[in-house]
């Protein structure tokens, strides 16, 4: 083992260019990165979370100061969440009758403590953030959580997951966020590979707000969960391009969603969304993890959830392989409202007669 948390932190405190050579480094509390820092890890440098510390590997200073950090780059290395040796605390009353957790913002102290979800990297309140050429290995939940970001770039991300936990997202963007690009996310996740969530829950809503002007280019997986999730519940998600999605998805390639409970004062709006160049299928053969086998088989590849409102959506150049699954390629659920939907050039080899299933209200 090389370095300690203290030694790496002392390098980060100097800001500027910070280089970590090959080796395995055990991290026992969150490393804090500040403005004007370029952290570069060698190809085989491993930052591994220590056993039973139940914390993130890295946070930015702005999470604690509430000030905006600028000009942060994190490049390279293997970020190992060591999930088999971490312990998430259950969210009180989650999933039981009367559960109001999805109607509550997260408590800042609980978010910082990270006890409910053990996020691996957290960047809150940033401008000019770049994360690139990284491998994320076995996080307890989300690999990276970015909230309240302006001008951000996430590129060349490898997900090396054992798929053992729920909520094993890849790149999770929490509103407000604008002017961002996410490209080349490769590997299998056990939740959303990429999520744009204007609003959240007690689990993750450290901030909330509009997400807009985002480009997503490239998701690649052999056993994916949901490729790209768009979520609005009170704030809009708008001006988003999604293209070059390749792979098999247990649930959805792209989903238009919200969180319950629905409230009139939290309208749902997903608008100006352009989706193109998808080469997708449902999984064939045995589905892993096996608990996903039954629900996954019938889930549509492109899905508009009940009670969402969407405007100006285009879907084009979609190829679905002959997967033999009894699941729609595109489905609009009951009570979903779409104003201005363009669908063209869909090649569906599934043979199930469910290329486009409309049970909602679609206005051309």
Q: Which sequence ranges carry the predicted segments?
A:
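Extracellular/periplasmic carbohydrate-active domains that bind, remodel
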Residues: 1-364
């Amino acid at each position: 083992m090389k370095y300690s948390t203290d030694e790496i932190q002392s390098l980060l405190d100097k800001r500027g260019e910070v280089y970590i050579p090959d080796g395995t480094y055990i991290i026992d509390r969150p490393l804090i990165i500040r403005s004007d820092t370029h952290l570069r890890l060698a190809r085989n440098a491993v930052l591994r979370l220590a056993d039973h510390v139940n914390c993130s590997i890295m946070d930015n200073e702005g999470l604690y100061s509430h000030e905006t950090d600028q000009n942060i780059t994190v490049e390279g290395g293997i970020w190992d969440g060591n999930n088999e040796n971490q312990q998430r605390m259950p969210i009180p009353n989650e999933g039981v009758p009367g559960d109001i957790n999805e109607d509550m913002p997260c408590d800042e102290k609980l978010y910082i403590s990270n006890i409910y979800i053990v996020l691996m990297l957290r960047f809150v309140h940033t401008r000019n953030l770049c994360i690139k050429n990284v491998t994320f290995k076995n996080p307890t939940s989300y690999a990276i959580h970015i909230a309240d970001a302006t001008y951000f770039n996430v590129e060349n991300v490898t997900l090396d997951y054992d798929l053992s936990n729920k909520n094993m997202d890849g790149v999770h963007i929490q509103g407000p966020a604008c002017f961002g690009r996410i490209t080349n996310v490769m590997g299998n996740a056990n939740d959303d590979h990429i999520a744009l969530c204007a609003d959240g829950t007690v689990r993750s809503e450290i901030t909330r707000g509009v997400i807009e002007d985002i480009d997503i280019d490239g998701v690649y997986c052999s056993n994916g969960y949901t490729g790209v999730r768009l979520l609005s519940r009170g704030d809009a998600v708008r001006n988003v391009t999604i293209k070059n999605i390749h792979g098999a998805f247990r649930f959805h390639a792209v989903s238009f969603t919200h969180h319950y409970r629905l409230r009139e004062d939290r309208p749902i709006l997903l608008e100006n969304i352009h989706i193109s160049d998808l080469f997708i299928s449902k999984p064939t053969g045995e589905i892993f993890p096996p608990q996903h086998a039954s629900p996954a088989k019938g889930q549509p590849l492109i899905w508009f959830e009940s009670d969402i409102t969407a405007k100006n959506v285009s879907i084009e150049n979609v190829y679905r392989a002959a997967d033999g699954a009894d699941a729609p390629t595109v489905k609009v659920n009951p009570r979903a409202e779409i104003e201005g939907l363009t669908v063209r050039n869909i090649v569906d080899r599934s043979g199930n007669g469910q290329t486009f299933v409309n049970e909602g209200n679609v206005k051309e």
